[in-house]
Amino acid sequence: NGAAGQKVLIYGENFGNDPSLIEVTIGGQKAPVVNVQSTVIYCIVPTKAYSGEIQVTIKQGEEIYSAEVAEVKFEYQRQVVVSSLCGATSEQGSNSAKDGPFNDCGSITNPCFMTWDPEDHNLLYDAEDAGDAEGVGQGIRCFDFTNKQVYTMIPKNSFVGSQRCRTIDFYKDDNGKYHMIVGLAQGNVNSTAVMMFDRIEGGTKPCGFTWGNGRVIVQNQGCQAAAIHPTTGDLYFSNYQNSLLYRVKKYVIEEFATGKRTTPVRPGTADDAAQTILKVQDKEWEFNIMIHPTGKYAYFMVINRNYILRSDFNGETFTAPYVIAGVNSNKDTYIYQDGVGNQARFGNPYSGVFVKNPEYAGNSDEYDFYLTDRHNHAIRILSPLGQVTTYAGRGSASLNSNPWGYANGRLREDARFNRPKGIAWDERDNTIYVGDANNYRIRKIGLEEDINE
């Protein structure tokens, strides 16, 4: 038994000594033959050799001789591998993006943040930024796994004052209805920072509803992220220009949800204003907000300074953050290194998702944090204790010396990404989805039997 890439010796008679004349299939898949002697063949287990039947064929001139299928089957063990869900690299970039089936949807442009619909876990949303180096996104896209379709759920022209949607979250009102919360980045202090959208039944989308009635609920500049606390319902959002974290209390968000309040809130000291909670560090710290599912703490991913902060929740709000991994460094300094705490190095840690680790069952924290390391072209794992390891990417070393590119296959040996940004986890089958920005694709990390190349 074993997985793809394992060495196998097949014993028999009259094999000869020329590997070019030998063909071996395992589970119907052709196995690379490394060497052969009269009584033994040395080969490598191919991918997707699920059924395990072993067949040997020998060529001799015009004749082809096939041995009987071996009575003993190879017990193939599936691997977790990287492949593509949808999208395509295109010189046109965003101009080639279109709605359509997974296998014909054009490019996926600048997928910077990904999350699931809270009421239908077959709908995966993608916030596409329309204003940075990875291209012009389309707004908020939907990957519909029921219908295997990609479509634009909220076009970028629906955003007031900015087309740079950076994050998506959801607020559940007192009546049990969900509202989409979208963080928008722009430079005018009087323009949009956060918008709210309502779920509207009907319409032409395959999922049977749309997100509409968009309205501005927060005005400020430089919002890089907006997130709802999972237990208090308060809204937290970031500010780039002054590196501040703001909070808007739940009752204010509830009033926007019900229509009681229509005037956007702005930073201030009043109870119903956007209150300053803390300062991350210096000016122009670009940081994403990733709140733990329990709400006990949040990671502030300081994208342009290449490190990650942790801020603990004291029951009322988040407290002064401290470094959990990486080192504050110049924004264009990208170093790749696994390690613990400040021994680890990143190249734009962009976004992340908390993933349950069965080995932590019963611990105070049962989650690892999987994150996209944008300029290191890798998916990294941050443990609760600050250990950083590389999960996927930077493979296929035989191609060239670059860590970036497009390659599917085994997590570390083969797979390559090119500026990954968004990431989501499907708890049902333990699958990871990655917004691979410069490959214009959504990549999938899961068991190979479940993956369509």
How would you label these PLM feature ranges?
Residues K59, E119, A127-G131, G183-G187, ...:
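Short loop/turn segments immediately following the C-termini of beta-strands
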Residues N122-D126, K177-G183, D234-S238, Y297-M301, ...:
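Conserved beta-propeller blade signature
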